[in-house]
Amino acid sequence: MADPHAVGVVSGLTLDSSFDSLCKLYWRTAVGIALGVRHVLEALNENGYLIDTLHVTGGHTKNPLLMELYADATGCAVVEPLADEAVLLGTGMVAATAAGLFPDLNAACVAMQQGGKKRAANPAAGTRFDRDYRIFLEMHRQRQALDEIR
């Protein structure tokens, strides 16, 4: 979400605590996160950036379904790192730059990166998320209106 003051909203939550219901809640939460990333990317791209690739790190990279979701919901290619500990590798890149081993962070990244597996967005699948994204934006607008009442 490209609004640092936004709060989370869950719509349609029921008292059903069955396994299937919890799976649906988990999936819709993941979709919400992916749409939040899409919102941030759109804000950046509207302000002069041209982001079309996401380099992801962390535990969620172990879930191919989430990586597919991020690609399809954002329309960006997703690069999953080959490094086992990509976050630590990134920290090492910053440290190597600070220690003067590289002239800048970009040079450290180019020299130390270990590549990754690139997953392309599926445009046909992405259009399924357009409706969800319109709902996402409308819920954000409504949440802002509620905040103004306070």
Regions found by a protein language model. Give the residues of each.
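Activation-segment/catalytic-loop signature of the eukaryotic protein kinase fold
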Residues: 1-89
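Acidic, glycine/GT-rich loop-and beta-edge segments that sit at the periphery of enzyme/chaperone cores
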Residues: 23, 99-150
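Short, small-residue alpha-helix embedded
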Residues: 89-98
